């Protein structure tokens, strides 16, 4: 069993003429996107409001939805696998930590992603504790309510939940 995030294998990301159109829109949010990010590279995505940054991040995380939610063209790959099929390889920290705080207790919230990966219970809780330590919430009890957390604590809790999953790609 490993709780060491540093032992996680970094993921490579490739886009081939990728685009996405939300079902409620006439025009594509992004179109003809091409890039190749090698494992371990760090990339900054910068752009104006409405430029498609969140759409690309959601696409990489595999959470854009099916055909009823929009139309995809081209390929968006993580380690050569369609991003929609590689969800466990990618961790997404949302802009608004309140939208990522799902459960009532800090430990449950941190463990949530690992539970969805069907990891053994002991490993889930070891990873959750290690992730809370990494983000500076080592003092936080697993049964601590998420309701009274400050904005900064919520952001760190969201990051801990993602790090506990040991993603190869952190967004």
Give the label of every model feature segment.
Residues 61:
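Helix-to-loop junction immediately C-terminal to a conserved catalytic motif
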Residues 123-140:
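Conserved ABC ATPase "signature" region
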Residues 145-149, 153:
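Conserved ABC ATPase signature
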Residues 2-32, 64-69:
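A short, flexible loop at the N-terminus of ABC-type nucleotide-binding domains that lies
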Residues 159:
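Hydrophobic anchor residue at the start of the ABC signature
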């Amino acid at each position: 069993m490993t709780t060491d995030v540093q032992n996680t294998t970094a993921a490579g990301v490739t886009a081939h003429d990728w685009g996405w159109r939300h079902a409620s829109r006439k025009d594509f949010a992004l179109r003809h996107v091409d890039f190749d990010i090698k494992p371990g590279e760090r990339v900054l995505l910068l752009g104006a409001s409405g430029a498609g940054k969140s759409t690309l991040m959601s696409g990489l995380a595999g959470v854009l939805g099916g055909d009823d939610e929009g139309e995809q063209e081209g390929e968006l790959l993580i380690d050569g696998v369609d991003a929609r099929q590689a969800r466990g390889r990618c961790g997404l920290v949302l802009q608004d930590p309140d939208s990522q705080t799902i459960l009532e207790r800090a430990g449950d919230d941190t463990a949530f992603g690992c539970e969805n990966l069907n990891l053994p219970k002991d490993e889930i809780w070891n990873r959750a504790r290690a992730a809370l330590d990494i983000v500076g919430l080592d003092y936080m009890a697993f049964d601590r309510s998420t309701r009274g957390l400050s904005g900064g604590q919520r952001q760190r809790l969201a990051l801990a939940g993602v790090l506990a999953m040991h993603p190869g790609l952190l967004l």
